[in-house]
Amino acid sequence: MNHIQEAFLNTLKVERNFSEHTLKSYQDDLIQFNQFLEQEHLQLNTFEYRDARNYLSYLYSNHLKRTSVSRKISTLRTFYEYWMTLDENIINPFVQLVHPKKEKYLPQFFYEEEMEALFKTVEEDTSKSLRDRVILELLYATGIRVSELVNIKKQDIDFYANGVTVLGKGSKERFVPFGAYCRQSIENYLEHFKPIQSCNHDFLIVNMKGEAITERGVRYVLNDIVKRTAGVSEIHPHKLRHTFATHLLNQGADLRTVQSLLGHVNLSTTGKYTHVSNQQLRKVYLNAHPRAKKENET
């Protein structure tokens, strides 16, 4: 990558507080774009709208999903917007390119029984289970992003208000409450997990060496929990975030409150969680609709 692209990624990291995972995606998108430029003998600063359309066709020819293509085009549009702020002679070739429509997927979430099974897996009275349980509790109890989790400091935990202050996207702070189970797991972890007691930093979640845990480390922990849990086949941090939102809405929480807890800027982003479970929809329907049941049915 050239120095402009490197400066762009650094701006996303420092000024916009992008996570490691998101930055890696942006970097991969730029590398793939550079490979296309080299293959077609094109220059970054003379790239035109016609070339952008050809690049769109090139991406589709690689049998990528529309969501992936959409993200890659968005990355390049954002990159050129950044470059334009540095050089008035640069034109954004992607600004008029029609965004491919995204496939709509319902967010995946865990049922309450599945969450109970996951928590039972980390009930063992071991040092590692103390740490693993606090990760699981915080992600499910608060719905925070994994990038927010790994940056929590000990002083961000408020045991008086029973909640945590996190730094979200765009460096925006928000306070998210947690319940009694989460509080207890944090207290047990701080009191009995030896690596956290001997470290020389303030990060809350650490690995077995006492070092601040990484996003990759959190994913490893969650995958390890799943391997030891019968009846649960897949997990990722965002699935726990989906579960948090879905369970709140299923129990009657209003959309605006969930939006605030998740740290979403737009209500439409939170709206995808109103799918609730099919089982919950049918339960509400049967109880609410006058002609949902015949008189002799229960």
UniProtKB/Swiss-Prot annotation:
Gene3D superfamilies to which the protein is assigned, alphabetical: 1.10.150.130, Intergrase catalytic core
Record key words, sorted: Cell cycle, Cell division, Chromosome partition, Cytoplasm, DNA integration, DNA recombination, DNA-binding
Domain Tyr recombinase: 105-286
Entry's Gene Ontology molecular function annotations: DNA binding; tyrosine-based site-specific recombinase activity
Function: Site-specific tyrosine recombinase, which acts by catalyzing the cutting and rejoining of the recombining DNA molecules. The XerC-XerD complex is essential to convert dimers of the bacterial chromosome into monomers to permit their segregation at cell division. It also contributes to the segregational stability of plasmids.
InterPro entries, alphabetized: CB, DNA_brk_join_enz, Integrase-like_cat_sf, Integrase_catalytic, Integrase_recombinase_N, Integrase_SAM-like_N, Recomb_XerC, Tyrosine_recombinase_XerC/XerD
Compartment annotation: Cytoplasm
Name of this protein: Tyrosine recombinase XerC
Catalytic residue list: R145, K169, H238, R241, H264, Y273 (o-(3'-phospho-dna)-tyrosine intermediate)
One Gene Ontology cellular component: cytoplasm
Family: Belongs to the 'phage' integrase family. XerC subfamily.
